[in-house]
A protein has these predicted regions:
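Structural preference for long, well-ordered alpha-helical segments in enzyme cores
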Residues: 4-5, 9, 27, 57, ...
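Transmembrane alpha-helix termini and helix-breaking/packing motifs in multi-pass membrane transporters
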Residues: 2-23, 93, 98-100, 207-211
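C-terminal transmembrane bundle of multi-pass solute transporters/carriers
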Residues: 58, 65, 79, 85, ...
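Helix-loop junctions on the cytosolic side of multi-pass membrane transporters
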Residues: 15-51, 130
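Mid-bilayer segments of alpha-helical transmembrane spans in multi-pass integral membrane proteins
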Residues: 1-4, 31, 175
């Protein structure tokens, strides 16, 4: 939803207004988080010691690394983000500026990406595949079509369609991945496994931006 709204704002009002509204949303988010009432942690039983953060990290790593299928997907996803973040954060804006219509075209393209993300979530609610992870991973390569279409570059409507498809694919993958984790990872280990999943998936993203 955010990318869709941002695309509309940038393409109609310009990037300056987009940045201003973005800053405002961060302010609102900060106020909302500040006002959240977080329940106190469960008190320890008499004689029980609180587990150190390093012990929690070790236990989380064991839960994560002992499930090889999770490790393989996270490693693969880390390389996906290595390329995707560099494409979306650097290459796409430069190509749009030099070969197409600048910020307005970028906004329209990102609007398509955002709409695709919404549709991907809707499809994930409707589709009940026997192998959700296979479906999620199978639709990710559509992102390569988006990159190819922009590299040529193809007409804006083609960029819109490929961005839409990428949004659908990425959110289908995310929804099916979360479903698979919650189905096969015990509740008491889920938060720790998810932490290593998030870190591992995004670890190469800054390198993609740098390269």
């Amino acid at each position: 939803l955010g990318a869709s709204v941002a695309g509309i704002v940038v393409s109609t009002a310009g990037p300056g207004w987009g940045l201003l509204i973005d800053a405002g949303t961060f302010l609102v988010a900060g106020v909302l988080v500040y006002r959240m009432k977080v329940p106190n942690s469960t008190p320890l039983a008499e004689g029980e010691k609180r587990e150190s953060i390093f012990s929690q990290l070790r236990q989380g790593w064991f839960e994560f690394s002992s499930r090889k299928w999770i490790v393989y997907v996270v490693v693969g996803y880390s390389f996906f983000y290595l390329g995707f973040e560099g494409f979306l954060g650097v290459l796409a804006p430069v190509q749009i500026k030099e070969a197409m219509g600048g910020a307005k075209d970028m906004g329209i393209m990102m609007f398509g990406f955002g709409v695709g993300a919404i549709l991907g979530t809707v499809f994930a609610l409707k589709i009940r595949p026997r192998r959700p992870l296979l479906l999620g991973l199978g639709v990710l390569p559509v992102a390569a079509l988006w990159a190819f279409a922009l590299a040529v570059p193809l007409p804006l409507w083609v960029l819109f369609i490929t961005a839409l498809g990428t949004g659908i694919g990425m959110d289908l993958m995310y929804a099916n991945w979360m479903t698979t984790l919650q189905t096969h990872v015990p509740d008491e280990a889920l938060s720790r496994v998810s932490s290593y999943d998030a870190f591992g998936s995004m670890v190469f993203a800054p390198i993609g931006l740098f390269l």
